[in-house]
């Protein structure tokens, strides 16, 4: 049965997460395992993925479907943020051995390599750009799935999707829901999935909130939940 963890009362969490807020969120999700499908709300809270991954006790890889790299350097006194959490996880989680990010524009990927080329974790990272997805050239992803031999944690930000399939509060990609599901299915067929989370709701903005946006996201969420949930059940049965 679905479980709703209420975190609205936790302050200092929107985009940036203070250490005090981090402790409170971790306490809220403490009773629950990483294995499952976790909905995180808007991309402003994508850093919660880092907390779920910290529950894993064996070496693992992260596959991230996202319009952004989420590998910025931490700003504002080193606070964890929705734009820096992947970098923070690579720096702090010794069990995270590989990361494959699918969806960012090529220019964003180039910025990561330019700004992080000396970082010890950079060789753990591979990318498939938005431009490569548009022409169905996902060589790095296919190679990752072929060579990776450890469990995978899957994280999906719906901002990778075109506007027909989702309404996010950040700039969006051009991938269709059907194309995203094909990529996720490929991962399930070739990897052991340690857990899944989904974010990308359209954070409520005054004067910019339509029922059609909520309905669109709810429809996509239901498809993701039912489809991925079925694949998780099948994987458990076939283990």
PLM regions: where:
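Catalytic cores of soluble, metal-dependent hydrolases
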Residues: 1-40, 44-61, 84, 94, ...
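Adenosine ribonucleotide-centric catalytic and binding domains
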Residues: 60-91
């Amino acid at each position: 049965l679905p479980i709703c963890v209420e975190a609205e009362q936790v302050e200092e969490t929107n985009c940036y997460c203070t250490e005090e807020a981090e402790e409170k969120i971790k306490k809220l999700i403490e009773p629950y395992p990483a294995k499952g499908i976790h909905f995180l709300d808007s991309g402003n809270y994508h850093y919660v993925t880092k907390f779920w991954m910290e529950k894993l006790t064996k070496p693992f890889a992260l596959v991230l479907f996202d319009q952004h790299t989420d590998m910025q350097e931490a700003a504002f006194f080193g606070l964890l943020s929705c734009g820096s959490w992947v970098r923070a996880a690579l720096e702090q989680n010794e069990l995270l051995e590989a990361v494959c990010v699918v969806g960012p524009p090529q220019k964003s990927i180039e910025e990561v390599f330019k700004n992080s080329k000396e970082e010890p974790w950079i060789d753990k990272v591979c990318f498939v750009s938005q431009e490569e997805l548009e022409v169905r050239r996902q060589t790095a992803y296919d190679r990752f799935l072929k060579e990776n031999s450890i469990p995978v944690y899957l994280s999906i930000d719906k901002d990778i999707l075109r506007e027909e399939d989702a309404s996010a509060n950040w700039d969006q990609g051009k991938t269709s829901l059907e194309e995203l599901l094909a990529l996720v299915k490929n991962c399930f067929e070739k990897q052991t999935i340690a857990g899944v989370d989904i974010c990308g709701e359209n954070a409520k903005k005054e004067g910019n909130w339509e029922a059609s946006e909520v309905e669109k996201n709810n429809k996509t969420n239901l498809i993701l939940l039912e489809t991925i949930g079925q694949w998780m059940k099948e994987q458990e049965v076939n283990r």
